[in-house]
């Protein structure tokens, strides 16, 4: 671990193509953290299978996600980049924490309730219920100080803290108590068609989201079709959520403040503004897209990054899990 550096853990599921919401909300912020913190950036493939995945698609998206991390500026020399399933300690720790969790507290999780409604016709898997316990294990085995999360994940961080404190008080001091880290930069990117909802790749309307790998002509089309209003003024206000969302996208791409954007487009209407938002987004994404495509031609390199990352991650995680096993009364295998 980096000397005297605080530890950060975060991850993204390879359960679908990444949107610009994933990029601006998570990955771009992670890049800013890598010099100041000891960062563990994971591809959380175990979380992905709480909902059925096609095996070949899961493998393809996992490699693409690793390539996207690196192409976006996450340096494998400075950070630990690894695949969750390559470190069995995640599942070992989850089982021990699972046995200290209560069904009531897990079933009260907002995300579980929301996803249960979605899958009630096909049957709700136990993985959906236990998902937050695996997330707690992910964080605690690296003795993470901070966890970059969106506001929709703060409930899971609270559960992680509760489980850490429960284990510490039942046995003895084992885990650091992590805190959620909500970055000050960036913005929550909303749906282009329903701007009061978060942008999601699972939307039925493909015009509502932009993928990191969308080509320029698709980005231009989706921004041109983005919902605005009949006010006709580029203003950053909750009364104009569609315009506000496009302003956030432009601000994330260019670094311009929303006040500067308002001033620049005063009296211009939406057509020129939308064209410029699309151009700024294309300029931001094109170098990443090119680098991703280049990296995907060298799968051996990507797998080597993951192998080295898993070795480093396992060294730290196994130390924590050994402590957990000893404290609950397991006989540790002879080395």
UniProtKB/Swiss-Prot annotation:
GO terms for molecular function: ATP binding; tryptophan-tRNA ligase activity. Gene3D superfamilies: HUPs, Tyrosyl-Transfer RNA Synthetase. The keyword Secreted does not apply. InterPro entries: aa-tRNA-synth_I_CS, aa-tRNA-synth_Ic, Rossmann-like_a/b/a_fold, Trp-tRNA-ligase, Trp-tRNA-ligase_bac-type, Trp-tRNA_synthetase. It is found in: Cytoplasm. L-tryptophan binds at residue 138. GO terms for biological process: tryptophanyl-tRNA aminoacylation. One of its GO terms (cellular component) is cytosol. Keywords: Aminoacyl-tRNA synthetase, ATP-binding, Cytoplasm, Ligase, Nucleotide-binding, Protein biosynthesis. A motif ('HIGH' region) lies at residues 14-22. Pfam families: tRNA-synt_1b. A motif ('KMSKS' region) lies at residues 198-202. ATP binds at residues 13-15, 21-22, 150-152, 189, 198-202. Belongs to the class-I aminoacyl-tRNA synthetase family. Homodimer. Catalyzes the attachment of tryptophan to tRNA(Trp). This is Tryptophan--tRNA ligase. It comes from Clostridium acetobutylicum (strain ATCC 824 / DSM 792 / JCM 1419 / IAM 19013 / LMG 5710 / NBRC 13948 / NRRL B-527 / VKM B-1787 / 2291 / W).
């Amino acid at each position: 671990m980096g000397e005297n550096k605080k530890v950060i853990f975060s991850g993204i599921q390879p359960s679908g193509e990444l949107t610009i919401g994933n990029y601006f909300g998570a990955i771009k912020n992670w890049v800013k953290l890598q010099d100041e913190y000891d960062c563990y950036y994971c591809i959380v493939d175990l979380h992905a299978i709480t909902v059925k995945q096609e095996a070949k698609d899961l493998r393809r998206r996992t490699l693409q996600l690793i390539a996207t991390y690196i192409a976006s500026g996450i340096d494998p020399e400075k950070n630990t980049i690894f695949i969750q399933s390559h470190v069995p300690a995640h599942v070992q720790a989850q089982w021990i924490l699972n046995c200290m969790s209560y069904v009531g507290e897990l079933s009260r999780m907002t995300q579980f309730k929301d996803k249960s409604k979605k899958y009630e016709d096909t049957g709700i898997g136990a993985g959906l219920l236990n998902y937050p316990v695996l997330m707690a294990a992910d964080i605690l085995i690296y003795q993470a100080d901070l966890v970059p999360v969106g506001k929709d994940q703060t409930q899971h961080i609270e559960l992680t803290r509760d489980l850490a404190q429960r284990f510490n008080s039942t046995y003895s001091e084992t885990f650091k108590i992590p805190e959620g880290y909500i970055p000050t930069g960036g913005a929550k990117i909303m749906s282009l068609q329903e701007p009061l909802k978060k942008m999601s790749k699972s939307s039925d309307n493909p015009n509502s989201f932009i993928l990191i790998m969308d080509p320029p002509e698709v980005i231009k089309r989706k921004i041109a079709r983005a919902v605005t209003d009949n006010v006709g003024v580029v203003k950053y206000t909750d009364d104009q959520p569609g315009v506000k969302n496009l302003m956030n996208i432009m601000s994330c791409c260019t670094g311009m403040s929303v006040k500067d954007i308002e001033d620049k487009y005063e009296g211009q209407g939406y057509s020129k503004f939308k064209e410029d938002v699309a151009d700024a987004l294309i300029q931001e994404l094109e170098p990443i897209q090119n680098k991703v495509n280049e990296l995907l031609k060298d799968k051996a390199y990507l797998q080597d990054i993951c192998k080295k990352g898993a070795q480093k991650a396992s060294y730290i995680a196994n130390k924590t899990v050994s402590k957990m096993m000893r404290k609950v009364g397991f006989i540790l295998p002879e080395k």
